[in-house]
């Protein structure tokens, strides 16, 4: 038996990496009976049948798992936003952050296309990123001339997953980092201000201290797994200040003696972050039940 990590999955064949050696594996029938499928990122134990082929016997317990796209055991989720084309959106960024925290993922923020951004807009984005840094996020704002290799190798060890809207430059970023990958990229649609999906599956690529993965771009975000009363926990500063609210289950909307509302009034919480919380709270409160 060998133990390795699934780095690629296409048509039911799972490519497993074992110290740089790749094996094409398939799961045993037991997984189908249990209606359980391995995903990219899984640590698996498999039996070698032929040269570089085998059958998966066991999938070890996952530390975490992103559902869309399916990838597991993520050490850091890098949320990639572009400054322009498509335009930087704190609302979209906050929604990605909520998704990340709902799956217990560590998140950091990468903003691209600085070289295409007017100076005034750069200043505006830098000011917004300072707010996120004060909340506790690591942020970077990069342009075409920035050294991607230096950036990636400075990131934490383990599995890094790039996630974000279509057209923000995830595949372009990886092509600069590893030109031999030659990943397909697309210009964004001028009419829709968003990109086409060029990455169609998740694949892990080796880096100095782990792996890095591109993921298919999102056209819509799914919050079906999140309850309205959980959302406050995924806005980190609301969660932090909410610990001293009068009521333990305070949703920071109309409740008396709410410390979050107090911190908002004195400027310790950004108004746009609180507004995005309210929007998402109302959206999830009013969603229709799916059967």
UniProtKB/Swiss-Prot annotation:
GO MF: GTP binding; GTPase activity; metal ion binding; rRNA binding
Keyword Disulfide bond tagged: no
PROSITE patterns hit by this protein: ENGC_GTPASE (PS50936), G_CP (PS51721)
InterPro entries reported in the protein's UniProt record: G_CP_dom, NA-bd_OB-fold, P-loop_NTPase, Ribosome_biogen_GTPase_RsgA, RsgA_GTPase_dom, RsgA_N
Compartmental location: Cytoplasm
Residues holding Zn(2+): 245, 250, 252, 258
GO biological process, one term: ribosomal small subunit biogenesis
Cofactor remark from the record: Binds 1 zinc ion per subunit.
Task performed by this protein: One of several proteins that assist in the late maturation steps of the functional core of the 30S ribosomal subunit. Helps release RbfA from mature subunits. May play a role in the assembly of ribosomal proteins into the subunit. Circularly permuted GTPase that catalyzes slow GTP hydrolysis, GTPase activity is stimulated by the 30S ribosomal subunit.
Subunit structure: Monomer. Associates with 30S ribosomal subunit, binds 16S rRNA.
Name the record gives this protein: Small ribosomal subunit biogenesis GTPase RsgA
Gene expressing this chain: rsgA
